Amino acid sequence: MKLSTKALAPAVLLAVCTYAGSAAAQQSFSSLTCRAGTITGIAKAQDLVVFGIDQRGIILADDAAKTFNNNTQRCIGSIAIIRGKSSGGGFCRNIDPATGDTTIVEWTSAEKPGTGTFKYLSGTGKWSGITGGGDYQTAAVTRPVDEGTYQNCVRVKGSFSVPKM
């Protein structure tokens, strides 16, 4: 069976319009995220330290749209520092205080301690279908208030899009 161009034109137009209507533009954001957490040692050798982290914090947006402002955050993961180079990763759940909607983020640390990248894996409510990501860099490190803990802030920059409903 041979399909004519005239027969396919309405279907193609419908598909393009449907896709264009559901697509969303990338939106940039930036924030300072401050958190406190616990460190659990897993291994320690001459040129190697491996530890797990469990942290909680708050996102302080500094972009004009105040994207993710006052979202609370919980992250877990593990990090290894081998001969001064860092590697590791984990996951974070961010909660919008106004709606309870969440985003789930996967983070990966870079070789330089305190830096890395992240990407959005999923979201609920207004964040359903979120995609995007960015990078982070340590902005402030303090002396731990208690042994086995840490407190710090990271500068976060990225972009995301959410399909229009």
Task: Give the positions of each predicted feature.
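Cleavable N-terminal signal peptides
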Residues: 11-13, 23
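N-terminal signal peptide c-region/cleavage motif recognized by signal peptidases
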Residues: 17-20
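Bacterial N-terminal signal peptides that target proteins for export
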Residues: 1-10
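Beta-strand-enriched cores of mature, soluble protein domains
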Residues: 24-165
